[in-house]
């Protein structure tokens, strides 16, 4: 939770420790189904060749599935707890709910007491590199628009579309499974160009142009220098 995050930050300061958190996709791995690492995208954005502001669309069309199979089931029927499961320990600080096999094991993400479905589970992995690409690590959206059915208090449901808008006009658009805009949706879109899945770009000779530009600063140097 936000409160727990604040307490972690306070403990780090109080004990004069080093702490860093983001995802590995800033560094080198291919960014899920996008078909490229983050580095050339960062070079392209920082070059200004796409213009500004930018819109980033995270959807199945651009290579990112939201795992809607991680939704919960309403009105679960209580079941006998398996003899090899300490259900009380599994619940931990979460409020007690009668055991049902769908509440634990591989499908626990579909219940608000333990997770938030594919959006909160995969969102950190999908959106952290985008914050980095857009240079938004030190800021937050000024407006969030959500198109989703009313959610059940226990079981996580689906959603259709979420739009984050920043004060400079940049947007991050999340499109839920089955609600994609369709067609050949660009992953990154600016007033001067577009980038699609597989690093297809509307800017001519983009790879040659990027080869002449400096690489972005490594993302792990600050931690190593602190150590």
Regions picked out by a protein language model, each given a short descriptive name:
Residues 18, 155, 225-227:
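C-terminal helix-rich "cap/oligomerization" subdomain common to oxidoreductases
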Residues 59-65, 94, 148-151, 178-179:
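Glycine-rich beta-alpha junction loops
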Residues 80, 88-168, 213:
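Rossmann-like dinucleotide-binding domain that binds NAD(P)(H)
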